[in-house]
Amino acid sequence: MNLTKQPPRRPSNLSIAGIVGLARMTDKARAFNNETLGEYLYGGDSGLDRKILDFLSIPDEQFAEAVEEYDDHTLDTWVIAQSTRTISEIEEFNQRELSIEPQTEEYRQRLKDRLAKYAPDRTDIKTVLQSVELDDWGNFWQLDLTKQPPRSPYNRNIAGVFGIARMAEKAR
């Protein structure tokens, strides 16, 4: 995963263990291991990653090792085995994270700036994770296919399906 060329999966993606942000953190951990993290933060340096790792009681170093060893499907099983969290605790965590609105003036301003820059007519983007998703989209939507090819047709990082990321880039 090279996060200088594409964003990690959306924080709202639940494809690994049904946990908000875990698929995104997986992409960032893989990029961290490959030294292609770009401007993204991983583990203890990232607020959302830190919340997820604390919630699961998994150290960031151990998680980084696991993403090297396991594909997404096997990682899903590994995370569930490592964590003692119940389905209801995971659902509560997800709901809380998906609904958090910016709490400080700095984060409220960051959301306003992103809205002004990328989606001035949108009034439905209100949460921290929606702001992150908007920022990812804004920073990567103008991929110039005359300068580099689209992602590999073997890339499965959108919904776990081969070719969707490539098709989306070509459609732009």
Label each residue range with its predicted role.
Residues 1-62, 66-91, 95-96, 108, ...:
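Polar, glycosylation-prone regions of secreted, cell-surface, and some intracellular proteins
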